[in-house]
Every structure is written in C-alpha cells, then in structure tokens.
C-alpha cells in the first residue's frame, strides 16, 4: 500500500505533500513518511493505527463486518460517541454501500481472522517513528472504541515535532462529531 501511495504521487507529479491519515490510513501515511520522508511536508494522524496495541472489540467487529443492516447498525455504535449521529438512516446508507458488487469480497479479504496480526503488520518500529522529522498533528476522540487513545499518546511521545489534540465526548469520528472545531485545527 505504501508503494501504491508513492506511485500515485509520482503519477500525479506531486513531489512533496501534506498527508492526512485516518485510522488504518494513519498507519499508511506514517509508513509512507518513514519510507520517503523527503516526499512529505506535514502529517495529520487521526485515531491512528501504527503502534503496538491489542485489537479492540470495536476494531475486530468493524474488520469482521458481515453485510446486514443489523450488523452495520451495531458497528456504527463503535464509531460515534454521540447517539444523535447513529441512526437507522445513516446505517441504511452505509449498509447499501457495503452490498455493492465486489465490496464485501474485497473488504473481507483484507482483514481475515485472526485480526490481531493485521494490527501488528501495520505497526512501525519505534526507532523509525522517533526519527520522523515532520510536523505532525495527532487527533483522537477520548471515547474512541475502535482505536485506543493510548495509540495517540504514544505517537505524541515518540514523534519529536508532534502536537496532540484530544476531543472529549468523541469517538472514532473526530472529523464528523466535532467538524467545525476539527476544521479549525
């Protein structure tokens, strides 16, 4: 995936970019910055994977999603702290997207059980993370049930030029649950 990201930058003729990575995408953004630091200006990591942690019940449920409206409704409860955001209408939209031809097959092939191995595979070495020279904004929801807040605390400790912002009353959807404040960051 990192190679694909670098190939995309090349295809678009982009020499140096700001990278924003959410969750699994945070691990990929960080891995790309480690592999090709000269291609990255700044990093934004949101509820990021990339450091060691035991898989959460929420992440295991999300990665193990089997298409049904009920399952979609259930996993959405892991994403948001605010019950106002989790409703049947949104669950229906996300469920319908999940049953498009080919989606379920490709999604389930990405993270088959046992899933802890995929968390471990996305982990970057501590020394590599500590060597990142980039200004890095780390954002996390305090009540995140998918990726533990401790991940962002570790990243903030290890990345020399990191700033950490934790949103209270917020789950894994920082950009949705606190959109106006998130955008001001």
For each of these PLM feature ranges, what is it?
Residues 132, 138-140, 144:
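Short beta-strand/loop motif that positions the catalytic acidic residue
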């Amino acid at each position: 995936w990192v190679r694909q990201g670098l190939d995309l930058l090349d295809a678009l003729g982009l020499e140096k970019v700001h990278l924003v990575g959410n969750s699994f995408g945070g691990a990929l953004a960080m891995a790309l910055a480690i592999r090709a630091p000269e291609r990255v200006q700044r990093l934004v990591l949101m509820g990021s994977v990339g450091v060691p942690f035991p898989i959460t019940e929420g992440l295991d449920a999300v990665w193990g999603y089997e298409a049904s409206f009920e399952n979609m409704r259930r996993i959405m409860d892991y994403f948001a702290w605010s019950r106002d955001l989790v409703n049947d209408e949104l669950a229906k939209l996300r469920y319908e997207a999940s049953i498009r031809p080919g989606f379920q097959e490709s999604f389930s092939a990405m993270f088959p059980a046992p899933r802890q191995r995929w968390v471990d595979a996305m982990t970057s070495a501590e020394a590599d993370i500590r060597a990142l020279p980039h200004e890095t904004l780390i954002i996390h929801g305090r009540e995140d049930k998918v990726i533990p807040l401790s991940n962002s605390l570790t990243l903030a400790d290890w990345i020399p030029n990191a700033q950490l912002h934790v949103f209270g009353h917020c789950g894994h959807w920082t950009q949705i649950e606190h959109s106006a404040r998130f955008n001001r960051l």
